Amino acid sequence: MKIRASIRRICGKCRPIRRRKRVMIICSNPRHKQKQG
């Protein structure tokens, strides 16, 4: 899980979602998981 100020898609399978008022990126590749914070 990477925590970044600005999150962006790394590949075509990355999907932005909102959880607990935070934007996250979920992907089939676990290295692409990101959280905005």
UniProtKB/Swiss-Prot annotation:
Q: Which UniProt keywords apply?
A: Chloroplast, Plastid, Ribonucleoprotein, Ribosomal protein
Q: Name one GO molecular function term.
A: structural constituent of ribosome
Q: InterPro entries recorded for this chain?
A: Ribosomal_bL36, Ribosomal_bL36_sp
For the keyword Hydrolase, the answer is no
Q: Give yes or no: UniProt keyword Ribonucleoprotein.
A: yes
A Gene Ontology biological process in which this protein takes part is: translation
Under the cellular component aspect of Gene Ontology, which terms does the record hold? chloroplast; ribonucleoprotein complex; ribosome
Q: Where in the cell is it found?
A: Plastid, Chloroplast
Q: What PROSITE patterns does the record tag this protein with? A: RIBOSOMAL_L36 (PS00828)
* Protein family (similarity comment): Belongs to the bacterial ribosomal protein bL36 family.
- NCBIfam families in the record: rpmJ_bact
Q: What is this protein called?
A: Large ribosomal subunit protein bL36c
Q: Recite the lineage of the species.
A: Eukaryota, Viridiplantae, Streptophyta, Embryophyta, Tracheophyta
